[in-house]
Structure formats: structure tokens, C-alpha cells
UniProtKB/Swiss-Prot annotation:
Residues 1-25 have a biased composition (Polar residues). It comes from the Eukaryota. Residues 1-35, 48-81 are annotated as: Disordered. Residues 124-232 form the sHSP domain. Keywords: Chloroplast, Plastid, Stress response, Transit peptide. One of its GO terms (cellular component) is chloroplast. Its main location: plastid. This is Small heat shock protein, chloroplastic. One of its GO terms (biological process) is response to heat. SUPFAM superfamilies: HSP20-like chaperones (SSF49764). Pfam families: HSP20 (PF00011). It comes from Pisum sativum.
């Protein structure tokens, strides 16, 4: 049900009145206002807030995501939203950060390739997608690849501590150019990767070739016991 209110003569406070001037009478009219329960619920999900001003037209917009009552707060993130392929594999997806499990790295790889396929404009021309590291969990062995450009065999140390694969490298290089400017390069790798239980830790093999470290870990043979159950 709507509420009806009768409006009579109204004078706007914004309009100035000169002394002696008369205000013309306005005939009464009817205005209907819906009750609060009749107002539709607004399903707003995204609200854009943009800074004002007379300066240059830079895009300072911020995406504000309104969360339902069940959520615990409001998520705010600056646009454009970056996907996992935009984040450097040596940043948030750093495989060299301490103590990662092999399952985490496999999940990260899946997420990278899914984003590259589903996001429009990615991988235009059918180019190859290559991340600086890769893990393949095969039937009889686990194979790993880590790109380590500029690193020699003497700079890399691979070891297994209990169930953890440890890869360390500290490479420094300094060259003097013909233009009297010295060139320095420094790379440091340090990772601890927890291995699954079905690995033969004593038979881990590592090879460094053309700046790429290849690691092969054989899997243990699982003996399956088959027991025939007699049906009565």
C-alpha cells in the first residue's frame, strides 16, 4: 500500500525573494510514496568509486565488491585484476620459497595454464607457454625442470634431507665492458620441496644442461595384494 501526501504551496529556499514580491499560489497535488516494504531489494554487486577533481583524466577507479550478509566484510581490490599468469613465477608463485609441497606446485601450474587458455587475448598466435619451472608426475618417476640461466654446475647443490628436496645456488658474475662500465649479475636460489612418500630418495638424479636443471626421482614399486572373496 502506498502513502498519499497532500502538497500545498511550496517556496524553494534556494530562490531569493525580493521585498514586496508575491509568491503565486500553487494548486495542491497528490504524490504517492511506496512503503518501505514495497521497495525492491537492490542486488548491487559492483560499485565503482572514482576520484573527482579538475585535473587530468587518469583512471583512479577502484573496484568495490559488496559482499552478502553471510560474508565477513567487504573486499576491495584495485583494477584491473591480475591473473596468475600476470604474476611473476619468482614472486607470489615463487617455487624457491621455503618448504613447498609438490602438490602445491602442481596446482599452481594448472592454474597458470587454465588462465592462459580462458582469458581472452592471451597467447595470441599460438605461442608456447613456458614457466621457469615444471613438474611431471608420471607413473614410474617424478621429473622436475628448473630454469637457472647463467648458473654453472659448480654453483648448484642438490640434496635430500629426510623427505625434503633441497636446491641451493649462489652465482655472482662481474664483467668489464669496453665502455668502462662494469656489468654485474647475481642470482640466488634456495628451495625446500617436500617429496611424497612413494619416492626412492636414494636414487635421485640431477643434471644441469644449458642453464636448465633437470631432476629425476624414481617412484617405489607398489605391490598390490589381491585377495579373492568367496561369495556365499
Amino acid at each position: 500500500m502506498a502513502q498519499s501526501v497532500s502538497l500545498s504551496t511550496i517556496a524553494s529556499p534556494i530562490l531569493s525573494q525580493k521585498p514586496g514580491s508575491s509568491v503565486k499560489s500553487t494548486p495542491p497535488c497528490m504524490a504517492s510514496f511506496p512503503l518501505r516494504r514495497q521497495l525492491p531489494r537492490l542486488g548491487l554487486r559492483n560499485v565503482r568509486a572514482q576520484a573527482g577533481g579538475d585535473g587530468d583524466n587518469k583512471d583512479n577507479s577502484v573496484e568495490v565488491h559488496r559482499v552478502n550478509k553471510d560474508d565477513q566484510g567487504t573486499a576491495v581490490e584495485r583494477k584491473p585484476r591480475r591473473s596468475s599468469i600476470d604474476i611473476s613465477p619468482f614472486g607470489l608463485l615463487d617455487p624457491w620459497s621455503p618448504m613447498r609441497s609438490m602438490r602445491q606446485m602442481l596446482d599452481t601450474m594448472d592454474r597458470i595454464f587454465e588462465d592462459a587458455i580462458t582469458i581472452p587475448g592471451r597467447n595470441i598466435g599460438g605461442g608456447e607457454i613456458r614457466v621457469p619451472w615444471e613438474i611431471k608426475d608420471e607413473e614410474h618417476e617424478i621429473r622436475m625442470r628448473f630454469d637457472m640461466p647463467g648458473v654453472s654446475k659448480e654453483d648448484v647443490k642438490v640434496s635430500v634431507e629426510d623427505d625434503v628436496l633441497v636446491i641451493k645456488s649462489d652465482h655472482r658474475e662481474e664483467n668489464g665492458g669496453e665502455d668502462c662500465w662494469s656489468r654485474k649479475s647475481y642470482s640466488c636460489y634456495d628451495t625446500r620441496l617436500k617429496l611424497p612418500d612413494n619416492c626412492e630418495k636414494e636414487k635421485v638424479k640431477a643434471e644441469l644442461k644449458d642453464g636448465v636443471l633437470y631432476i629425476t626421482i624414481p617412484k617405489t614399486k607398489i605391490e598390490r595384494t589381491v585377495i579373492d572373496v568367496q561369495i556365499q
